[in-house]
A protein has these predicted regions:
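Conserved catalytic breakage-reunion loop centered on the nucleophilic residue
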Residues: 1-209
Length: 211
C-alpha cells in the first residue's frame, strides 16, 4: 500500500499538469481562431445588435433589419432634435414600440435583458444611450472588447480599447458618419437638462440636421 501511495503522489500531480497544459493549449487555439474571424470582419456574437440580423447566406455577416433599423434612425433623429435619452425612451414606450429584447423574442430569439416592467422589457435611457453610442450603426464592427485572464478564470474583464478589433465599413450602415459624430458630441454635452426633462439645452450652438 505504501508503494502505491507513493506512486500516486507522483502520478496524480503529473496527470494534473498534463491536463492543465492540454486545457491551456485548447484555450489558446480557440482564442486565436476567434481573433482570426474577428479580423476578417466576421460577426461571432450570439445575438446581433438591434437594427441588424444575420444574413441567411452567411451567419457571420450582418444585414439590415428594415423595421428595427427604422427605429434606430428615429432614435438618432430625436436626439439630433435635442431630446434627452429618457424622453426618447418614454416616447418609444408610449408609442408601443417593442424594446430590443421583446422585438428579438418576437422574431424567435432567446435574447434576455434586465430592463423589465411588469415582466415585460421596456425602453430605458440606458438602452437608448447604448444605441446612440454604438458605432455598429455607421458600419464599423468592434469585437473582442472582453476576455478572460486565462482558461482557469471564467470572470470576464474589459480589455484596453487599443486591443479591441475594429473593422471599419464592414457592413451597410444605418446612420451617416456625420450624424453619428454630432450625436457623440451632444452626448458629451448632456450636462444641462431643460425643466421638463424632455429637451437637452443646446450648449454648443451645433447645427442639428434631419436623418
Amino acid at each position: 500500500m505504501t508503494g502505491k501511495s507513493q506512486g500516486d503522489e507522483i502520478i496524480i500531480p503529473f496527470k494534473n499538469l498534463i491536463n492543465d497544459a492540454y486545457c491551456r493549449d485548447i484555450s489558446i487555439k480557440i482564442r486565436s481562431h476567434l481573433d482570426v474571424k474577428r479580423k476578417n470582419g466576421e460577426y461571432i456574437g450570439a445575438f446581433v445588435p438591434y437594427g441588424y440580423e444575420k444574413s441567411d447566406d452567411d451567419k457571420h455577416k450582418l444585414v439590415i433589419d428594415i423595421y428595427a433599423a427604422g427605429i434606430v434612425k428615429e432614435i438618432f433623429r430625436l436626439k439630433l432634435h435635442g431630446m434627452s435619452q429618457d424622453a426618447i425612451a418614454t416616447q418609444l414606450n408610449n408609442e408601443g414600440v417593442l424594446a430590443p429584447m421583446e422585438y428579438k423574442q418576437s422574431t424567435g430569439s432567446g435574447y434576455q435583458t434586465g430592463f423589465l416592467q411588469n415582466d415585460k422589457s421596456v425602453w430605458s435611457s440606458v438602452t437608448v444611450r447604448r444605441i446612440l453610442e454604438n458605432e455598429i450603426y455607421i458600419g464599423n464592427l468592434v469585437q473582442g472588447k472582453r476576455t478572460t485572464p486565462n482558461h482557469k478564470v471564467k470572470q470576464e474583464v474589459v480589455k484596453p480599447e487599443s486591443d479591441w478589433i475594429r473593422i471599419e465599413k464592414n457592413h451597410e450602415p444605418i446612420i451617416s458618419d456625420r450624424d453619428f459624430e454630432i450625436v457623440q458630441r451632444l452626448l458629451g454635452m448632456d450636462t444641462r437638462i431643460s425643466p421638463d426633462s424632455d429637451m437637452v439645452y443646446n450648449l454648443s450652438g451645433l447645427s442639428l440636421i434631419h436623418i
